[in-house]
Amino acid sequence: MEGKEEDVRLGANKFSERQPIGTAAQGAGAGDDDKDYKEPPPAPLFEPGELKSWSFYRAGIAEFVATFLFLYITVLTVMGVSKSTSKCATVGIQGIAWSFGGMIFALVYCTAGISGGHINPAVTFGLFLARKLSLTRAIFYIIMQCLGAICGAGVVKGFQQGLYMGNGGGANVVAPGYTKGDGLGAEIVGTFILVYTVFSATDAKRNARDSHVPILAPLPIGFAVFLVHLATIPITGTGINPARSLGAAIIYNRDHAWSDHWIFWVGPFIGAALAAIYHQVIIRAIPFKSRS
């Protein structure tokens, strides 16, 4: 026991990661069959002990760094496309979509075992509604994600200030020809697809039944981001991540970037909530199981 306490003191995980993207978080019950499978217990709303755990702060740092890298690569890609005078000389919308999807794939893979690999306040919100993490951790994650996004966009502006300010800074706005309602709807549906994919790819019951599911989880999540970007870049530039939208808007800081900004918070949070309800209530029927 003394050795175990020493590990905790030195920074080893005292509190188990509840984020479902983390492979260790949902490993319990791997030997159970479908009939005997037991749902993981819901995370407490508030867990004061987390604030004394190094793993809590380590997870927040991982979210900060991941979101920083995400904004850095993706906004640089957007600037590269904007700089080109010919569609044939650039990667185009497909390349932008690949940069977003590819970075999510890589970063979820890298951070899944540390923080759960959220990299998105909408994902964190959806998982919180499903009681996969505490309110304390959810708020901390969202703050760190937003700070990372601001820093990532800021570094891009520092590298290419003229190009950055002259080409919209990667900020999300509703494109001409579309209404705010169109933009809101695109963000709701796009985020629903992403968060539903997160729930499905990291489902605890599937993880218990099929050992390969946790390892492959980053792939469908990244691919969902790629496909949503292909569909909605012409409408809103594709938000589906409030931290990504906030970071670009703060660093770009022009009126038209702020006039539509509410869409990129309200839409993703509604989409995440709908995905959480759909998966937990309809697909998994967890509220009904708890009564039986």
UniProtKB/Swiss-Prot annotation:
InterPro entries: Aquaporin-like, Aquaporin_transptr, MIP, MIP_CS. A motif (NPA 1) lies at residues 120-122. It is a multi-pass membrane protein. GO terms for cellular component: cytosol; membrane; plasma membrane. PANTHER family: AQUAPORIN OR AQUAGLYCEROPORIN RELATED. It is found in: Cell membrane. Residues 1-42 are annotated as: Disordered. Its main location: membrane. Aquaporins contain two tandem repeats each containing three membrane-spanning domains and a pore-forming loop with the signature motif Asn-Pro-Ala (NPA). PROSITE patterns: MIP. Aquaporins facilitate the transport of water and small neutral solutes across cell membranes. Keywords: Cell membrane, Membrane, Repeat, Transmembrane, Transmembrane helix, Transport. Belongs to the MIP/aquaporin (TC 1.A.8) family. PIP (TC 1.A.8.11) subfamily. GO terms for molecular function: water channel activity. The chain crosses the membrane at residues 61-81, 96-118, 139-159, 181-201, 215-235, 263-283. A motif (NPA 2) lies at residues 241-243. The lineage of its organism: Eukaryota, Viridiplantae, Streptophyta, Embryophyta, Tracheophyta. GO terms for biological process: response to water deprivation. Pfam families: MIP. This is Aquaporin PIP1-3/PIP1-4.
